C-alpha cells in the first residue's frame, strides 16, 4: 500500500493518509494528491481488488470480502501507533468507515480522523443508486455524474463498457452491503472525529446528506464545501483541505486540543 518516501516534519512522524476511491475507479484519482496535501502528510492510495494491479483478483461485493482483501495489510501498517487518517470518496467513504470500525473492534489504533467526500452516510442511499438498473440506465446514471466518457467511448462493445461498467455495478453492490452492515452493527458510533466534504456543484450529495455523518461519531463532526462537482477529488481543493486536516489532528495528537483548534 505504501508508495514513495513519506514527508517529514520536525516534530514527530508524518500523518499517513490512506485514500479510497469512488465506485468504478482505481487509485489514479489520487495520483496528484502527494504534491498537494502539503508537508507532514504521506499519501497512500489504497487499491481495492479487481482493478489496476489487482485486476486479476475477485472484486469485493460484501463486507467480508472487503475486509479479507484490505484489513490485514492495513492493520499491519497502523499497529505501530503512528498517526493516520482515512479518506474515502463516494463509495470510498463507506469503505473507509467500515475499515475504521473493523480496526477499532480489533483493538488496533483508531484513525486520527475519518474524512469522507461526496459520500452519503450509511443511512442514506444515493439518489439514482440502484444495482438493478439496466446497463443502459446505469450508463446514463454514470454519465450524469461525470463518471463515464461521452459518445462512442462508452458505447456498448467499447472497452469502457465491457470493463468499467461491470466494475461499477459490483462497486454499487458493495456500497449497499456496507451500508446495510453498518446499520446492523451494534458497536455504536466511532470514537474519532469525522470530516465530511462536499462539492458545491454536486448534484447527488448535498450538505443535508453529508450532515447525516454526524450520527456516526462520538467526536467532533465538521462539514466543509469545496469547489467542484461529485468528482472534486480530481481537483486541487480536496487534497489541500484534507492535508490541513491531517496537520490539525497531528498537532492535536502532540498537544491535546479540539479538532477546531486548527483552521480547516
Residues of each region from the PLM?
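Non-catalytic, mobile gating and regulatory segments of ester bond hydrolases
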Residues: 1-264
